Amino acid sequence: MAAPKSAVRKPRRKDKKNIAVGQAHIKSTFNNTIVSITDPTGAVISWASSGVVGYNGSRKSTPFAAQLAAESAARQAQEHGMKKVDVFVKGPGSGRETAIRSLQAAGLEVGSINDVTPQAHNGCRPPKRRRV
């Protein structure tokens, strides 16, 4: 009979990558803001979102939650030696500019800022108007 496997798994150790230049992808929707910091090839080094930082519901869509998410992602990336990022912003949300500013405030040098928001050429039907 085979020996039983232990129920406790060892957490995988994150090895330190030494990457000085990378990309910051900020996806800002009406409900949330997600910040991913990648190396130049696109492999994710660190990420954070408004929900991971500790906000729920409508508070996730605030600029302050986006600021905290960007600071958290920048801190993790700096542990891997990141110093300079090119920023790619996607989406119409309220946390766009705040996230870029907090990346700079966290100590990352921002090289360029590109808006990569997708534009539909008459694709999906948009959501209905709100009746408040």
UniProtKB/Swiss-Prot annotation:
GO terms for biological process: translation. Residues 7-16 have a biased composition (Basic residues). The keyword Iron-sulfur does not apply. Pfam families: Ribosomal_S11. Keywords: Ribonucleoprotein, Ribosomal protein, RNA-binding, rRNA-binding. GO terms for cellular component: ribonucleoprotein complex; ribosome. InterPro entries: Ribosomal_uS11, Ribosomal_uS11_bac-type, Ribosomal_uS11_CS, Ribosomal_uS11_sf. Residues 1-21 are annotated as: Disordered. It comes from the Bacteria. The keyword Nucleotide-binding does not apply. GO terms for molecular function: rRNA binding; structural constituent of ribosome. Signal peptide: none annotated. Gene3D superfamilies: Ribosomal protein S11 (3.30.420.80). Located on the platform of the 30S subunit, it bridges several disparate RNA helices of the 16S rRNA. Forms part of the Shine-Dalgarno cleft in the 70S ribosome. Belongs to the universal ribosomal protein uS11 family. NCBIfam families: PRK05309.1 (NF003698), uS11_bact (TIGR03632). Part of the 30S ribosomal subunit. Interacts with proteins S7 and S18. Binds to IF-3. This is Small ribosomal subunit protein uS11. It comes from Clavibacter michiganensis subsp. michiganensis (strain NCPPB 382).
